[in-house]
Amino acid sequence: MLNLPFLRRPIALDLKKPEPSAFPPMSTAEVAVRYHGARIGGDFFDMLSIGDRLIFIMLDIAGKRDFAFHVAATVQVVFRERAEDLFSAEPVNEADAITQLVLAMNRAIMEISGTAHFSTGFAGCFHQSLGTLTYISAGYTPALVRDSHGVQELAANGLPLGLFMHATQDAQMTVLEPGAMLLLFSRGLMEARNRRTEFGIERVRQVLTSSSATSAEGLCSEVLEHALTHMHGRRIDNDLSVLALMRLAAAATALD
């Protein structure tokens, strides 16, 4: 029988928690996150500003909260170290860099868990000057983008993390025009229920379509408040998380 050390979960662990994430100032964009936690679930986000790029991740790690946070703390260290390595030296091939970053996080999840550990995630690289978004959605709920053409869906394009040690993901690219908004939200928010129905992606889409929010923070608050209102005070069984990235309309004049 093969001796594979990463398949043996440690009996006892000094469980850790991830460090708080800072929101870097940007001249042409805004980013915000709103979070409403439950007793279970492992929603986690982090971001770094490296040169003219914002590198960010949003994960939904399966399992009980304490161990999910321990996994998140490990992933955070890997994310910050590898992102600095991959995105600091110009020129940067953003698609290759985000692919390598996701591969490193996938391996970290499996190694710290000692076995397969189902986790979905979204990893993105937003170039502030160009407005390009290079991303991998590893089994995560579909991201939504609102721009002058309406609301488009960025569907998951890769396998969930934590399942296969050497799985690689193909990065995708889109452009956020000035005034465009990117919205990421956790499965817990989409599945928030009242007595009859889930909140669902179509309600998220409706909120985004009709939103008059002028800031990323305002958009996050609006989406979360609609989800909580939909629940009519029912118990929250999973984390509700929302991340919004808004490219400011002023970015158009900044580039002229």
Regions found by a protein language model. Name each.
Residues M1-L182, H232-D256:
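… and, occasionally, acidic/histidine-rich disordered N-termini of signaling adaptors
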Residues F122, E177-P178, M190-D256:
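C-terminal catalytic subdomain
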